[in-house]
Swiss-Prot record:
This is 3'-hydroxy-N-methyl-(S)-coclaurine 4'-O-methyltransferase 1. Signal peptide: none annotated. PANTHER family: O-METHYLTRANSFERASE. The lineage of its organism: Eukaryota, Viridiplantae, Streptophyta, Embryophyta, Tracheophyta. Expressed in roots, stems, leaves and flowers. Restricted to sieve elements of the phloem adjacent or proximal to laticifers. S-adenosyl-L-methionine binds at D223. Transmembrane segments: none annotated. Keywords: Alkaloid metabolism, Methyltransferase, S-adenosyl-L-methionine, Transferase. Induction: Up-regulated upon fungal elicitor treatment or wounding. The active site is at H261 (proton acceptor). Pathway: Alkaloid biosynthesis; (S)-reticuline biosynthesis; (S)-reticuline from (S)-norcoclaurine: step 4/4. It catalyses: (S)-3'-hydroxy-N-methylcoclaurine + S-adenosyl-L-methionine = (S)-reticuline + S-adenosyl-L-homocysteine + H(+). Its EC number is 2.1.1.116. One of its GO terms (molecular function) is O-methyltransferase activity.
Length: 354
């Protein structure tokens, strides 16, 4: 009896250790993914009629003196991550690799590409900041990012143009994916409105997509002066520089897409109050696109949402919020009602009415 119990305990212990090893080496997944994007494995496979052998890939990589065994080990891990598929060729000698659905998200020229997101979030300085999680747990307002870099993330991006470009490209890549889903799943949300301001709209990716889908809407891009200065011009989109903590341009509808999660509750209440002042009481609304956390849920997206919350803790001092959090926040800002609508994304759509 004793030996059976010991064996069972040992088996559980091994599984626990394996789980912990996987967590410990979580950074390896990020950096293997970065390497895969940097050397263009997904694009090479696509351009080789969708499949490739190890020897073919060795000859096509933008690297000199590739060790085929080292490359094989990298590919083996990508197969384990379900990024690549693997089959044995007809001759039974060489393995043939192809892209799994997840792997197609690494294609640099794809509309759905997450390659810019991977490169933006895995740059050295952004990984270095995670060494200061402990320091970011204090009762003050100083984030782990500030402890690591000596300034907040927004100032860092302002004074480091190369890193800012990588970050912006990553955000734009994420925005393209999210905006496409938003316009398909919530088309009725945008119908009937006459004017919209994208508050904190970055380089204008979202507002351009909205204008293309709904050309009758008068569209405005609003962000900090240095962000507006680096955004692309569009003949039918007004660009306004400013500070959302000071004022927001008036319109029937204001959009806050992945903005409020960057900020504390106090900052968010301030932003929302400025937004409420800028929309008409009878026909206006604020559209918030952000995570609505379900803390106890076993939904497949829950871990991704919780990771984003820790990301906010470390980098911006903001947070992802539950439905109850959103209700409290909007009440504090003076909104009379709101509704939360899930979409096919990590985020949800929250419509707030003055």
């Amino acid at each position: 009896m004793g030996s059976s119990i010991d064996a069972e305990t040992h088996e559980v212990d091994i599984k626990d250790q394996a789980q912990l090893w996987n967590i410990i080496y979580g950074y390896a997944d990020s950096l293997v993914l970065r390497c895969t994007v940097e050397i263009g494995i997904a694009d090479i496979i696509k351009n080789n009629n969708g499949s490739i052998t190890l020897s073919e890939l060795v000859s096509k990589l933008p690297l000199s003196n590739v060790n085929s065994d080292n490359l094989y080990r990298l590919l083996r891990y990508l197969v384990h991550l379900n990024i690549l598929g693997q089959q044995t060729c007809a001759a039974g000698v060489d393995r043939v690799y192809s892209l799994k659905p997840v792997g197609t998200l690494l294609l640099k020229d794809s509309e759905r590409s997450m390659a810019p997101v991977i490169l933006g979030l895995s740059q050295k300085d952004f990984l270095f900041v995670w060494n200061f999680v402990k320091e970011g747990l204090g009762t003050g307002s100083t984030t782990a990012f500030e402890k690591a870099m000596g300034m907040d993330m927004w100032k860092y991006l302002e004074v480091n143009p190369n890193q800012s470009q990588l970050f912006d490209e990553g955000q734009a890549g994420e925005t393209r994916l999210l905006t496409k889903t938003l316009l398909v799943d919530c088309r009725d949300t945008f119908q009937g409105m006459d004017s919209l301001v994208d508050v904190g709209g970055g380089n204008g990716t979202t507002i351009k997509a909205i204008h293309e889908a709904f050309p009758h809407i008068k569209c405005t891009l609003y962000d900090l002066p240095h962000v507006i200065a680096n955004s692309d011009d569009h003949p039918n989109i007004l660009k306004v520089p400013g500070d959302m903590f000071m004022s927001v341009p008036s319109a029937q509808v204001l959009l806050l897409k992945c903005v409020l999660h960057d900020w504390t509750d106090e900052h968010c209440v301030n932003i929302l109050k400025k937004c409420k002042e800028a929309i008409p009481k009878e026909t206006g609304k604020v559209i918030i696109v952000d995570v609505a956390l379900e803390e106890e849920s076993e939904h497949e997206l829950t871990k991704a949402r919780l990771i984003l919350d820790i990301d906010m803790l470390v980098n911006t001092g903001g947070r992802e919020r539950t439905a109850e959090d959103w209700e409290n926040l909007l009440k504090r800002a003076g909104f009379r009602s709101h509704k939360i609508r899930p979409i096919r994304a990590i985020q949800s759509v929250i419509e707030a009415f003055p």
